[in-house]
Amino acid sequence: MRDPDALIARAGVRGDPERDQHFLVDNRVLDRLPGYLPDDADTSHVLEIGGGTGGLTDRLLSAAYRVTVVERDPTLAAFLREEFTEEIEADRLSVIEGDALEIELPSFTASVSNLPYGVSSEIAFRLLPAGRPLVLMFQLEFAERMAAAPGTDEYGRLSVT
């Protein structure tokens, strides 16, 4: 597995909170995420939104037959294409440069993503109609609103759906 800190160093970037970039670097979390898909999930084509420097992408390639990454940052999309050249040439990985809220998303059998915090609800609502298994990482406050019980301050549109 590729080391997430080494990927960030090779990419020559830092997460930029103002651009909603938060890179996941905890190997324990990265290693577990693909395993949260249901045991019977079809992993023939997994979609990742916000590939960043590829820490999760690398893990998904070990768990899925094919992965498509949507990355809106041109620098990071170019880095992913360079870092994962072999996987792209083997037709196991596609990198789409674009905003997941604006582009036409490819068909997929499951999605595992560390979503950009500022648009996590919009992306989640975009993925849900596909009816496919989703493993989505959210900011804690967002997750609390999503799981809120009726009558609590956090209860709202996210809780109802």
Placement of each model-derived feature along the sequence:
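Catalytic cores of RNA-modifying enzymes
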Residues: 1-161
